[in-house]
Amino acid sequence: MPELPEVETVRRGLTPVLAGARLSRVRINRPDLRFPFPERFVERLEGATVERVDRRAKYLLLPLSTGETWITHLGMTGRFTLDGTQLGEFEEAAPIAGKHEHFSGCAIRDGAATRIGYADARRFGFMGLIPTDQVETHPWFAGLGPEPLGNGFSGAHLVEAFAGKKQNIKVSLLDQRIVAGLGNIYVCEALYRARISPLVAAGSVSKARLETLASVVRDVLNDAIAAGGSTLKDFANAEGGQGYFQHRFDVYGREGEPCRGESAKAGGCTGTVARVVQGGRSTFYCPSCQRK
C-alpha cells in the first residue's frame, strides 16, 4: 500500500499540471472503486478549476472552485498518470494496464491540455467529493493525529500520546490517531534508525529517546520522498515511474540478512535482521542494536 512518502510523491507530481487547471472530458469507466463514485461525480468535476493539490495522511485533497474538495485515496494499487508531461526524476517506467483505468479526464492550464488517468487494479482506492468547509470534520479526517512532517509532531507529542501505554511502540506508531500517515515500512525503518526495539511498551520509552524518534521519523520520510518513495509490487508515481527508496531499506524485507555494516558502525552491530508479526503486520528489526 502506498504510504505517506509515496502519496506525497504523487502530490508533487500532480501539482504542476493540476493546480490552477480546469477539468474537462471527465469519464468514469465503472460505477465504483472500493466505494461507489459520488452521485453526479462527472458533472460535479466537469468545468471545475483545481485550486491546489494537498495531502492529509495518505489522502490526496484537491479543493475545487465549486466549493467542494475532490478526495482520492490510492488504496493498495491506485495510481495517477499524466500523459505527455515530464514529472520528477524517477529511475524506471512502470507500464499501466489500460483495462484497469477507471477514471480519466483532461486538465487544461495555460492553453495546454494534459490527459489524467487513474487506474486501480485491485480497486481498494476510492474517490469522494466533500464540501471544502466540512473536510476537517468529515469522518475520514476528524480523528487523524498530527502530520509527521508538520509542526504538531514532536517528541513532546509522543510523550503525551504514549503516557501509560502498554501497547508496543511499533503498533502504537501505526495508530493514525497518534500520528497521521505513518505506515509499516517507515515505522520499521524509523525504529531501526532510533535504535528502539519495536517490542517495547510505548509508555516505557524515555522522553530523550522519543525526541530522537520524532526527529528520525522526519528524516526517514524526507529521505523516502527525495528518492521518489518505495516500489513494492504496485506503487508508481504520477508519471508511471517507480520510487527507489526500497534499495535503501536498513531492515524492512531483509529477514535473515546481516545488519547493514555502514548503518551500524557506530554501535559495532554484527546482528541479523529478524521478523516478527505485530498487529497482523510484519515487523523487521535488528535484535542486537534495537534492544529493549
Place the predicted regions along the sequence by residue.
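Generic detection of long, well-ordered alpha-helical segments
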Residues: 1-4, 148, 152, 206-214
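Basic, nucleic-acid-binding surfaces and adjacent catalytic neighborhoods in DNA/RNA-processing proteins
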Residues: 22-41, 157-292
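Generic structural motif
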Residues: 53, 127, 273-275
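Phosphate/anion-contacting hairpin/loop surfaces
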Residues: 70-181, 186-193, 201
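Short, glycine- and charge-enriched coil/turn segments that flank and shape catalytic ligand pockets
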Residues: 40, 44, 65-67, 113, ...
